């Protein structure tokens, strides 16, 4: 692994990091013991940047990340989580867990307001048991998540006027180190970059061996604005990971066309 930095803030991280959605029992159940082994093995291998979110297992991932990182020197790792969803206690029978195979008994709901963002951060700190978060991502303001244009526009406006305002205040007062956007579409990330001053963007699945459309306008804009890119879901949620039993793309079953394309890539790269 190589040392890299988030340019504007000089946060030193490795070029490989650990996204902890799986610790929220994403697609399969993981025990607390297994989760601890994974986190500590990643740390022992030199990974020093860990990302989580309230959504992941409806708080479970944050609990597990915090439970293990609490025991380590706080200066030895960089930690990020996300804002935009709050968690409300719920009857387990009434929770739509989707792809989460278990998790905590809370229902997530969207809130990109100033007050909602401040509350979200405080609740994340309590779940983590860690009072310092380095990077905060404004999470999922995109069509993939919200589907309808009026909802995307509503939450984008709310995030600019509310969530970003809260994060900028925290950054200005050195309570956090960096502001980011965690998003599934580079087009929406571009809109944020044109409106507000972010330090980095966590882009999920849009710059991989299968997709490079973000090269045309998004990457040049990041370079111009000195915004670093954190590439999430580099295996496009499974199809590029080499496991023939997990041919998912964009969190759903891949089409035959995409599967054929991946098989062609394997021949090119001899894997």
Q: Which role fits each region the language model picked out?
A:
Residues 1-92:
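N-terminal binding-site loop/beta-alpha segment at the start of enzyme catalytic domains
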Residues 3, 34, 141-271:
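Beta/alpha (TIM)-barrel catalytic core signal, keyed to glycine-rich beta->alpha loops juxtaposed to Asp/Glu
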Residues 13-17, 48-49, 76-82, 132-137, ...:
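Structural preference for beta-strand elements that scaffold enzyme active sites
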Residues 21-33, 102-118, 152:
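Active-site mouth loops of central-metabolism enzymes
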Residues 21-23, 53-55, 82-86, 138-141, ...:
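Active-site beta-loop-alpha junctions enriched in small/polar residues
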Residues 29-42, 113-127, 184-191:
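Short, acidic/polar
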Residues 89-100, 244-246:
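Short, flexible, mixed-charge acidic loops at enzyme active sites
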Residues 125-149:
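Active-site groove signature of glycoside hydrolases
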């Amino acid at each position: 692994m190589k040392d890299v930095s988030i340019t504007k803030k000089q946060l030193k991280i490795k070029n490989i990091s650990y996204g902890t959605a799986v610790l929220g029992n994403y697609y399969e159940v993981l025990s607390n013991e297994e989760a601890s082994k994974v986190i500590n093995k990643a740390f022992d291998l030199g990974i020093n940047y860990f990302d989580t979110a309230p959504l992941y297992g409806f708080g479970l991932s944050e609990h597990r990340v915090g439970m293990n990182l609490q025991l380590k020197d706080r200066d030895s790792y960089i930690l990020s989580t996300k804002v935009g969803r709050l968690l409300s206690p719920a009857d387990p029978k009434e929770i739509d867990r989707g792809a989460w195979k278990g998790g905590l008994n809370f229902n997530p709901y969207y809130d990109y307001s100033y007050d909602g963002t401040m509350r979200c951060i405080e609740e994340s700190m309590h779940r983590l048991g860690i009072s310092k978060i380095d990077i905060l991502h404004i999470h999922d303001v995109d069509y993939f998540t919200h589907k309808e244009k009026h909802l995307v526009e509503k939450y984008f406006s709310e995030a600019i006027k509310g969530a970003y305002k809260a994060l900028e205040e925290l950054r200005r007062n050195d309570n956090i180190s960096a502001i980011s956007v965690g998003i599934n579409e580079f087009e929406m990330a571009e809109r944020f970059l044109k409106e507000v001053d972010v330090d980095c963007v966590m882009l999920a699945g849009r710059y991989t061996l299968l997709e490079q459309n973000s090269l045309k306008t998004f990457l040049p804009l990041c370079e111009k604005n000195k915004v670093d890119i954190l590439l999430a879901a580099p295996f496009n949620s499974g199809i590029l990971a080499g496991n023939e039993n997990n041919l998912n793309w964009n969190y759903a079953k891949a089409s035959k066309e995409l599967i054929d394309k991946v098989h062609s890539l394997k021949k090119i790269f001899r894997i």
